[in-house]
UniProtKB/Swiss-Prot annotation:
Chief location bin: secreted
Protein's organism: Coturnix japonica (Japanese quail)
Protein name per Swiss-Prot or TrEMBL: SPARC-like protein 1
Acidic residues composition-biased segments: 184-202, 312-328
Record GO terms (molecular function): calcium ion binding; collagen binding; extracellular matrix binding
Domain Kazal-like: 462-523
Keyword ATP-binding part of the UniProt annotation: no
Single biological process term from Gene Ontology: signal transduction
C-alpha cells in the first residue's frame, strides 16, 4: 500500500506542476501587473486565481495542464493501468482544446504568430525545467504521506488538496476552458519551497520587467503597422511562473537577436516606418518649394506694376498736346479724348494700387479674383451711368426709336471694354503658345494691363510690355457695333479704331483720330445759329421724358431710380398739366417750359448729377460729356456746338452754373441739393 500511495503522490505532483509560459498583461500603456506573478498559496482565495478575458480581447501564449486529483479511498482498488489511461485521455483532450484555441488566435491575428511560437517554445522549456526540480518535492511528499497513512488518516485530508477551477470566457465567441488547478499544499511545505525558490523568484521578477518592456515595444510597432486600434492582449494567469537561470539566459539571447533584427532594419515593420518618414520629409520639402514659388510670383507681380506705371506715364505724355492750326471743333474733340484717356489711365493706376494691396494680403489667385471683381464693378457703374445717358429719347423722335437707339448704344458701350479684354487675352494666349516649346512664362500678362489700342506681349527676357493692337486681328463684330471716327471713317468696332490710332501714334493724324459717335459714319450737317438756339428746348423736354419712363419701369423692377429720386419724379408724373412725350413743335415746347417751369428744374439737375462722376467735383470735363455726346450726334448734330458754347470761359470745364444757364434755368433756382 505504501508503494501504491507513493506512486499516486508522485504522479499527482507531476501533473499539478504549473508549466505556464511567461504571463503578461498589456494595458493602455503596455505594462504588466506584478500581482499576477505571485506564487499561489493554499490560503489564497479562489477569486484571485480566476482570470477573465474582456470582450474582443485576444488570448495568446497560455498553456494549461489539467491537474489530477489524488486518488480517494474508493479508487485504491482500481488498476494502475486504467488510471494511467484516464490520465492520458485527459492530457489528450487538453492538448486538443489548446490547439483549437491557438488556431483561433492565429486566425484572428496573423501578425501574432511569432509571439505564439515564442510562447510555445517557452512553455516547453519551462516544463523541462520544472520537472528538473520535482524529485526533491516528491520525496518530501512521499515521506509525509507515509507517516500520515500509518496514523490512519486519508491522503486527501493529509495533503489538504483543494480542487480549484479556472475558466476563461470569450464574449460573443465563447470558448470554455476548464482548469483543475491543484494549488494547495501544506503550510510547512510551502514555506520551505518559498525559501528554496526565493532566489529564482527574484530573478524571475527581474526578467519579467525586461521582457515586459521588450514586448511593449513589439506591440506598439505592430499596432502602428496595422494602423488601427487593436484589443488589449491579456497574457495573465493565476498560475505561478518559475524561471531558472538557464531559461533566463536563453530569453536574453532571444531578446538580443530580436533587437539586432530591428536595428538592422530586416523586419518589414521597420521598413514601413522608414518609408513613412521619407514620405513626410518629401511632403515638407514640397511645401517649402511651393511657398518659395508663391513669394517669387508676388515679387514679379509688384515689379510688373511698377514697370506698367512708368510705361503709362510715357504714353500719356506722348498723347498730350494740341495742334495750334486745328479749327475749334477738332481742338475740342482732341481735348475731350485726351481727358478721357487720362481718366482711363487714372483708373488703371487705382486698379494697380488695389492689386498691390491684394498681393500683400493673399496669393496670386486671390489677387486675380479681386481684380476681376473690381473691373466688373467699374464696368457696371459705367454701363449704368451710360444707360442713364443713352436711354434718353432723342429730340423729335418716337418712343420706339428711342428704345432702339438706347439698346444699340448700351450694347456698344458695354462691349467696348470687352473688345479690349478679348484682344489682350488673345495676344496673351498666342504668346503663351509661342513660348510653349521654350521656357514657361506663367502669368506674365494676366495682371498686366494696357490702355485701349494696345495689348500685352512678353519680350525675349520674359518682361511684359504693351504693343499696338493689330487692327486685322480684332474679332469680327456686328453692324450695330460699328463706330465712326473723327476722320469720318467707319470702323468695325472700338478695337479696330484704337488699334489704328496706336499705329499712327506720334503723327498729327494719330493725335486727331478719336471716336466721334456710335454707328456707321453718315453725313452730319452743319449746325446753324437757329438750330443751336432751339436745341435747349428739345433737350429739356427729352430729359423730363426720360425720367418719366424710368419711373414707369421702376414701378415693377425698382432698378433705375433710388427711393429719393422716385419720390421727386412722382410729383411730376402725377401732375395733370405735364406735357406728354412726343414730337412737338418748338412753339409748344417753349410755351410748356414757361407755364410748367418747376417741372424742368429737377430733370436738368439730375442729368448733371449723372454725368459728374469722375470725379464728383460739381463740374463736367469733356471726357464726362463724351458718352452723352457720342450717342446723340447721329440724331442731334448740334450737340457738339451746344457743349462748346456752354463753356463760357473756355476752360474745358462746364460747371453746374454754366450747365443750368444753357438750359435757361434761373440763377436763383440753381440748387446743389437737387443733385441726387
Amino acid at each position: 500500500m505504501k508503494t501504491v500511495l507513493l506512486l499516486i503522490c508522485l504522479l499527482g505532483s507531476a501533473f499539478t506542476t504549473p508549466t505556464d509560459p511567461l504571463n503578461y498583461q498589456f494595458g493602455a500603456h503596455g505594462q504588466k501587473t506584478a500581482e499576477k506573478h505571485k506564487y499561489t498559496h493554499s490560503e489564497m482565495p479562489e477569486e484571485e486565481n480566476t482570470g477573465f478575458v474582456n470582450k474582443g480581447d485576444v488570448l495568446s501564449g497560455h498553456r494549461t495542464i489539467k491537474a489530477e486529483v489524488p486518488v480517494l479511498d474508493t479508487q485504491k482498488d482500481e488498476p494502475w493501468a486504467s488510471r494511467r489511461q484516464g490520465q492520458g485521455d485527459g492530457e489528450h483532450q487538453t492538448k486538443n482544446s489548446l490547439r483549437s484555441i491557438n488556431f483561433l488566435t492565429l486566425h484572428s491575428n496573423p501578425g501574432l504568430a511569432s509571439d505564439n511560437q515564442e510562447s510555445n517554445s517557452g512553455s516547453s522549456r519551462e516544463q523541462h525545467s520544472s520537472e528538473h526540480h520535482q524529485p526533491r518535492r516528491h520525496r518530501k511528499h512521499g515521506n509525509m504521506a507515509g507517516q500520515w497513512a500509518l496514523r490512519g488518516e486519508s491522503p486527501v485530508d493529509a495533503l489538504g488538496l483543494v480542487r480549484e477551477r479556472n475558466t476563461w470566457k470569450y464574449n460573443k465567441n465563447t470558448v470554455g476552458l476548464d482548469e483543475n488547478n491543484n494549488g494547495s499544499e501544506e503550510e510547512e511545505a510551502g514555506e520551505e519551497e518559498d525559501e528554496e525558490w526565493g532566489e529564482e523568484t527574484d530573478y524571475r521578477d527581474m526578467k519579467h520587467r525586461a521582457r515586459g518592456t521588450s514586448h511593449g515595444r513589439e506591440y506598439r510597432r505592430w499596432q502602428n503597422e496595422n494602423s488601427r486600434p487593436s484589443g488589449e492582449f491579456l497574457r495573465d494567469s493565476s498560475l505561478p511562473v518559475r524561471i531558472t537561470k538557464r531559461h533566463g539566459e536563453k530569453f536574453s539571447m532571444e531578446e538580443e537577436s530580436q533587437e539586432k533584427l530591428y536595428k538592422e532594419g530586416k523586419l518589414p515593420l521597420s521598413k514601413k516606418n522608414h518609408n513613412e518618414d521619407q514620405g513626410e520629409k518629401r511632403q515638407s520639402e514640397e511645401s517649402k518649394e511651393h511657398f518659395q514659388v508663391v513669394n517669387q510670383r508676388k515679387h514679379r507681380a509688384v515689379t510688373k506694376r511698377q514697370d506698367k506705371e512708368g510705361s503709362n506715364a510715357e504714353e500719356d505724355d506722348n498723347d498730350s498736346g494740341d495742334d495750334g492750326e486745328e479749327d475749334l471743333g477738332n481742338v475740342w474733340r482732341e481735348a475731350v479724348y485726351e481727358e478721357e484717356e487720362r481718366m482711363q489711365s487714372n483708373d488703371q493706376d487705382s486698379i494697380t494700387n488695389k492689386q498691390k494691396e491684394e498681393i500683400t494680403a493673399g496669393d496670386d489667385s486671390g489677387v486675380y479674383r479681386e481684380m476681376q471683381d473690381y473691373k466688373g464693378d467699374k464696368i457696371k457703374d459705367v454701363t449704368h451711368s451710360e444707360d442713364n445717358h443713352y436711354h434718353h429719347e432723342p429730340p423729335n423722335s418716337s418712343s420706339k426709336q428711342q428704345l432702339q437707339t438706347s439698346s444699340s448704344v448700351e450694347s456698344m458701350n458695354s462691349t467696348e471694354h470687352e473688345d479690349e479684354v478679348k484682344t489682350t487675352g488673345g495676344s496673351y494666349h498666342e504668346e503663351s503658345a509661342r513660348n510653349s516649346t521654350g521656357k514657361a512664362l506663367p502669368d506674365l500678362c494676366r495682371n498686366f494691363h494696357c490702355k485701349r489700342g494696345k495689348v500685352c506681349q512678353a519680350d525675349k527676357q520674359g518682361k511684359p510690355s504693351c504693343i499696338c493692337q493689330d487692327p486685322a486681328a480684332c474679332p469680327s463684330t456686328k453692324d450695330y457695333k460699328r463706330v465712326c471716327g473723327t476722320d469720318n471713317k467707319t470702323y468695325d468696332g472700338t478695337c479696330q479704331l484704337f488699334g489704328t490710332k496706336c499705329q499712327l501714334e506720334g503723327t498729327k493724324m494719330g493725335r486727331q483720330l478719336h471716336l466721334d459717335y456710335m454707328g456707321a459714319c453718315k453725313h452730319i450737317p452743319h449746325c446753324t445759329d437757329y438750330e443751336v438756339n432751339q436745341f435747349p428746348l428739345r433737350m429739356r423736354d427729352w430729359l423730363k421724358n426720360i425720367l418719366m419712363q424710368y419711373y414707369e419701369r421702376d414701378q415693377d423692377t425698382s432698378a433705375f431710380l433710388t427711393e429719393k429720386q422716385r419720390n421727386k419724379v412722382k410729383k411730376i408724373y402725377l401732375n395733370e398739366k405735364r406735357l406728354v412725350s412726343g414730337e412737338h413743335p418748338v412753339e409748344l415746347l417753349l410755351h410748356d417750359f414757361e407755364k410748367n417751369y418747376h417741372m424742368y428744374l429737377y430733370p436738368v439737375h439730375w442729368q448733371f448729377y449723372q454725368l459728374d462722376q469722375h470725379p464728383v467735383d460739381r463740374s463736367l470735363t469733356h471726357s464726362e460729356l463724351a458718352p452723352l455726346r457720342a450717342s446723340l450726334v447721329p440724331m442731334e448734330h448740334c450737340i457738339t456746338r451746344f457743349f462748346q458754347e456752354c463753356d463760357g470761359d473756355q476752360d474745358k470745364l462746364i460747371t453746374l452754373k454754366e450747365w443750368c444757364h444753357c438750359f435757361a434755368i434761373k440763377e436763383e433756382d440753381i440748387n446743389e441739393n437737387l443733385l441726387f
